[in-house]
């Protein structure tokens, strides 16, 4: 697929690789007109794409070749603005501003909102990261825990909550830890077994925030690429080091599908909070499923990643919208009569006639 690729600054090196390959193929330096492998289709032709230049952060993404061709046909250059290393947030990727649309079951009717550019963690927060939070007194600094904490509908004090947020040995820490630390040789595994409140406290300590569903899904997908991301992600039944499954998101993040579930800010009508992406023991469909848990839940796959945003208060309020999903109460329905059933059933009947197939060309 022929496409026009430009960057700011010019002179950046362009590479691509097939999704199941570890080898990057060099294409040339910007500006350039080149051909990239793929299929002229919105649903097929995905490749990993990378632009690099000394003293600038690499731009990497999962991109759709059909999308690239459509831009080329419209005479729109693929323009990539690289970020100087001096302005890069450590271990984070920049997501450009623009419209954020949700390709998530039950949430497709939510408004499209426009976001400013923002930074999101390239990897899930690791055990080693969370250990620093604990070692620097994260569970002892009440100012990091400014959200109301409730258990079974009852508001509990911060001191009482700290007695709940303990590891398997009774020390403060994730439910999957013991003796105040993680399992041996798992420093680069995602921290899991944390409640929403623990994730939120860590984000405050790190001078970041948890992502809204809009910030999270914009970083995860351009246009619903779950069919190529989910099968290549960690839904294996056991956790893995972050980045071990070599599949990129739309803007170069790892493990947004699988490995650890990831807490978000959005409240749900039932008191839950959004938790996204699915964990290593979930089905692949969790990546695009509208899922939530009670914020005090500390299930073994509950993890998170953080963002740094520059949104105004109004935009953040829109992104952090209350999720009100419809739940049908089947017990409230009464059986219909046979007459009504037969009318509906008749809509699905067809004439069982011979197909009479013919071979036109062998």
Question: Regions from the language model: what does each represent?
Answer:
Residues 2, 92, 112, 117, ...:
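A residue-level signal for beta-strand positions that form part of recognition/binding surfaces
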Residues 2-8:
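A short, amphipathic beta-strand motif
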Residues 10, 54, 98-100, 280, ...:
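Solvent-exposed coil/turn segments that connect beta secondary-structure elements
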Residues 12-14, 304:
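Short beta-strand elements bearing conserved aromatic residues within extracellular beta-rich modules
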Residues 15-33, 38-164, 168-169, 192-198, ...:
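A short glycine-rich, aromatic-capped structural motif
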Residues 95, 160-163, 171-296, 300:
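Functional-site microenvironments in short loops/helix caps that host divalent-cation chemistry
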Residues 111, 137-138, 142-153, 238-239, ...:
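Surface-exposed recognition segments
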């Amino acid at each position: 697929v022929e496409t026009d690729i430009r960057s700011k600054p010019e002179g950046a090196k362009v590479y691509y690789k097939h999704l199941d390959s570890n080898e990057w193929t060099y294409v040339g330096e910007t500006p350039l007109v080149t051909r990239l492998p793929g299929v002229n289709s919105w649903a097929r032709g995905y490749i990993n794409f990378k632009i690099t230049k000394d003293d600038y952060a690499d731009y990497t993404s999962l991109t759709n070749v059909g999308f690239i061709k459509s831009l080329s046909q419209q005479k729109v250059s693929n323009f990539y603005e690289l970020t100087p290393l001096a302005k890069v947030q450590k271990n984070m990727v920049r997501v450009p501003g623009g419209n954020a649309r949700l390709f998530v079951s039950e949430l497709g009717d939510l408004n499209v909102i426009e976001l400013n550019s923002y930074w999101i963690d390239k990897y899930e927060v690791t055990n080693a990261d969370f250990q620093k939070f604990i070692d620097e007194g994260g569970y002892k600094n009440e100012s990091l825990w400014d959200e109301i904490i409730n258990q079974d509908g009852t508001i509990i004090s911060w001191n009482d909550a700290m007695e709940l947020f303990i590891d398997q040995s009774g020390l403060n820490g994730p439910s999957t830890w013991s003796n105040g630390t993680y399992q041996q040789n798992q420093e680069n595994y995602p921290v899991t077994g944390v409640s929403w409140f623990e994730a939120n406290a860590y984000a405050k300590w790190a001078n970041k925030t948890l992502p809204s569903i809009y910030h999270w899904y914009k970083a995860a997908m351009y246009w619903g690429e779950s069919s190529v991301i989910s099968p290549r992600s960690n839904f294996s039944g056991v956790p893995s080091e972050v980045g071990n499954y070599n599949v990129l998101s739309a803007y170069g993040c790892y493990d947004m599908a699988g490995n650890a579930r990831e807490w978000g800010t959005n409240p749900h009508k039932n008191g839950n909070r959004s938790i996204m992406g699915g964990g290593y023991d979930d089905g692949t469909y969790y990546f695009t499923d509208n899922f939530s848990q009670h914020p005090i839940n500390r299930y073994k796959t509950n993890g998170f990643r953080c963002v740094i945003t520059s949104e105004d208060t109004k935009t953040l309020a829109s992104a952090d919208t209350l999720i009100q999903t419809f739940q049908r109460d089947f017990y409230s329905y009464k059986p219909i009569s046979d007459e009504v059933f037969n009318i509906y059933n008749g809509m699905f009947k067809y004439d069982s006639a011979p197909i009479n197939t013919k071979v036109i060309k062998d």
